[in-house]
Regions:
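Small beta-barrel nucleic-acid-binding modules, principally OB-folds
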Residues: 141-153, 182-189, 241-252
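A structural signal for short beta-strand/turn segments enriched in small hydrophobics and glycine
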Residues: 166-168, 206-221
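Zn2+-dependent peptidoglycan hydrolase active-site motif and core
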Residues: 161-202, 227-229, 233-234
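Residue-level detector of conserved, well-ordered beta-strand and adjacent loop positions
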Residues: 149, 184, 194-197, 210, ...
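Generic detector of contiguous secondary-structure segments
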Residues: 111-112, 123-129, 191-208
Length: 270
């Protein structure tokens, strides 16, 4: 009888341990269940909501051999894409969602990894978070970028700099964007600079550029046939685009990226 009772207690203990382990697994799986292959297509991801103080903290951790994109990705996931604190442990995502996690990390790399300077070398530049607001010219659409304005309203006054290194993939006239430059960065992000008044000399498609190189000058071209200008105030429209896993082009919000490099404003005489 004692032997049977002992076996029964052992069986109960085993069952309790197994149930506890199962509950842990279920809780862990539930915690990461919202991460999908197409998470980078969600509106929450496209907002890129990372306050500058958190960006600075991640960069500080990067100096201790921690990977910026790794910390950024898990911080965004744990903060449900609107984080207030930094997270560093990605183990659950790597355990249960390794492929989905790597896809999302790659998307964040395309947006953030190559950015190294503010696009206008002046202290008097101002901008607001208008990503997603309604635009009507050329048909109903949303604003897919951030507009940067300077105190000087003259076209051609402010230089426009490349925020990243990369290759000039597109340039020339667009009915909406006017004279524009599109640069593909090393990690795959497409950085779009629009409404330029003119281009810097020797700028051409296929040319390699470095962060801080002058691309052209802030203007107000666009909203019409080639050469149209003056239909809106002088400003730079900055767009950032990535490719989704199924090769769909997606715009993301540049506002928070701009905030993260505002301290890296270059000084030029012009």
């Amino acid at each position: 009888m004692k032997s049977e009772w002992k076996s029964f207690l052992i069986w109960l203990l085993f069952l309790a341990v197994a149930c506890s382990a199962l509950q842990t697994i279920l809780a862990e799986r539930s915690h990461v269940s919202f991460l999908k292959e197409d998470t980078c297509e969600t509106w929450e991801f496209r907002q890129q909501h990372l306050p500058a103080e958190l960006s600075d903290q991640i960069k500080e951790l990067e100096r201790t051999d921690r990977n910026f994109s790794e910390i950024l990705t898990v911080t965004m996931l744990e903060g449900k894409f609107f984080p207030r604190i930094i997270f560093t442990d990605s183990s659950l995502y790597r355990k249960y969602k390794p492929e989905e996690y790597e896809l999302l990390k790659k998307a964040y790399q395309a947006v953030w990894e190559d950015v190294n300077c503010f696009p206008v070398p002046a202290e008097d530049i101002f901008y607001e978070d208008t990503f997603g607001e309604e635009r009507l010219y050329g048909g109903e659409r949303i604003h897919e970028g951030t507009d940067l304005f300077g105190k000087v309203k003259k076209a051609g006054y402010y230089p426009v700099l490349s925020m990243t290194e990369g290759t000039i993939e597109k340039m020339g006239w667009l009915p909406l964007g006017g004279y524009r430059v599109g640069i593909r960065s090393p990690h795959g992000g497409y950085f779009y600079y629009a409404h330029l008044s003119e281009y810097e000399k020797n700028i051409k498609e296929g040319k390699k550029v470095h962060a801080g190189d002058i691309l052209g000058f802030m203007g107000n071209t666009g909203y019409g046939e080639m050469g149209t200008s003056g239909k809106f105030p002088v400003h730079l429209h900055l767009g950032i685009y990535i490719l989704s896993p199924d090769e769909k082009e997606l715009s993301v919000n540049p506002y928070w990226i701009l905030n993260s490099v505002k301290k890296k404003t270059r000084n030029y005489r012009y």
